[in-house]
Amino acid sequence: MTDCLEKRIDRITILTGAGVSAESGLNTFRDSGGLWEGYDPLDIATVGALDSNRDMVLDFYNSRRSQLKDCLPNLSHLAISNFQNNFSGHVFLITQNVDDLHERAGSPQVLHMHGSLRSMRCD
């Protein structure tokens, strides 16, 4: 399979979303009991939210960081990491997730479309 892929494909892009990390036990945004339940996204996830609802925003994201500490990468994260490492330089991973489970699984490069819980910047 390696020879076949290397001869035919120069680059592969993988896009992941909430379903990948849900298998590790992370809550998603829209499911029943999801992260938005009880919150208006405009009160939590906008640039102005930090100014107008600082404590609520920090509590929301700190709670998510706390939940993430107890989660481990699952078989999907590991398979993607293995694929990336076997085809080094040919597989580009983009995730809509803000967790670091791809990195913990060993993925060498991950582009986080919506930022990362691992880094926080308040301007």
PLM segments and residue spans:
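Conserved catalytic core of sirtuin-type NAD+-dependent deacylases
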Residues: M1-D123
